[in-house]
Amino acid sequence: LARLELVLDDLQPLLLGSNLRDDNSSLTVDLTNPDIYRQGRLVFQKDLLHIVRTIVLWRGTAYQRIGVQNHGDRPAGFELTLLFDNDFADLFEVRGERRPRRGTGASRLLGPTDVLFEYRGLDDVERTTGLHFDPRPTRLSVNAATWQLELDPHESKSLFVAASRRRRGRTSLPR
C-alpha cells in the first residue's frame, strides 16, 4: 500500500507515541484527537479520544487493529476514516527514478467490506492487493473506508483491517 492514513472527522489525529517490538513483529501507535469544531463550535476538546493502532505482519498479511476509547464524560459521535491507495511502485520509483512506461492498474469494490487493487506489470505478471474491513464500514469506496462511531463515556470499540498481496492470479481476501 502506498497510503494508509487515519483521519478523525477529516482531521489528522495527534501522535502520543509509538513502539516497535524488539523482534519487529508489531508496531503500536498511540494517538488522540485534536480540538474538533463543528460550525465554529468546539464539540470535542483535545485528548478526549484515545486511538491505538496496532499492526502485525503474519503469513504475508498485514493485520491492523484500530482501538478507540472515549475518555470523556459525554457520548462522542464522530467519523473515523481510513484513506488508502496502492501505486505498485517498484524500488527504483520509490527512490525517485522515472520509468518511461508502467503497467496498468485498476481498483474495485468486491462487496461491502472488501477492496481489490490490481496491477499488470510490464513483465505481464498480475499483482493484487486485497483489503478487508471488519466491522463493515458505514461507507466504502476504492480509496476510503469510513465508520460513523458513537461511543458512550469510557466505551471502547475496535475496527480491524487486513491487507494482503499476491502475485499471479487472484488475491484470496484475508479474514
Regions picked out by a protein language model, each given a short descriptive name:
Residues 39-41, 45-149, 153, 157, ...:
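Polysaccharide-binding surfaces and accessory modules of carbohydrate-active proteins
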